[in-house]
Structure formats: structure tokens, C-alpha cells
Amino acid sequence: MVYLKRPYFRKSRSCPLAQCPDEDIDYKNRALLSKFVSEYGRILPSRITSVSSRKQKLLARAVKRARFLALLPYC
């Protein structure tokens, strides 16, 4: 019996922050940052949120600053 591989089609998902300029990703914008942080306080990876690598770096930096200033919890 011959097993055939199923073709894998990856859905192309666009970055949810594509329309958002880089200045809007700010450590003071808690509403935006809380969308990309899990319920345990961890930063969600870009493979789950489908954020581009540039925006992911900006998000991570903003979340870390917000944590340091006690705007977001560490856990």
C-alpha cells in the first residue's frame, strides 16, 4: 500500500499590526500590549500572533519596559 503525503497549504495571515505605525507600539499603550501577552504574563510568540519579526521586537521591548515600570505584571 502506498501512502501519499497530504499537501500542506499554509494560510497566509497578514500581520495584525501592519496598519499600525511603529510609534503606536508604546509601553504606555496597555490595551495593545495586553493582546500580545498571555494570561500568565508571558509574551506570545509571533507564530501564534502572526506578527512580523520587526513588530515582534518592538512589542517585546515595549512589554519589558511596561513590566519594569509596573504597568504590566510579570506573572
From Swiss-Prot:
Pfam families recorded: Ribosomal_S18
GO (cellular component) term, any one: cytosolic small ribosomal subunit
Residues annotated as signal peptide: none
Domain of life according to the entry: Bacteria
Keywords: Ribonucleoprotein, Ribosomal protein, RNA-binding, rRNA-binding
InterPro entries: Ribosomal_bS18, Ribosomal_bS18_sf
Any one GO BP annotation for this protein: translation
A GO molecular-function annotation: small ribosomal subunit rRNA binding
Entry keyword annotation includes RNA-binding: yes
Keyword Ribonucleoprotein tagged: yes
Record PANTHER family: 30S RIBOSOMAL PROTEIN S18, SMALL RIBOSOMAL SUBUNIT PROTEIN BS18M
Record's function text: Binds as a heterodimer with protein bS6 to the central domain of the 16S rRNA, where it helps stabilize the platform of the 30S subunit.
Subunit field text: Part of the 30S ribosomal subunit. Forms a tight heterodimer with protein bS6.
Family of this protein: Belongs to the bacterial ribosomal protein bS18 family.
UniProt protein name: Small ribosomal subunit protein bS18
Organism: Anaplasma marginale (strain St. Maries)
Gene: rpsR
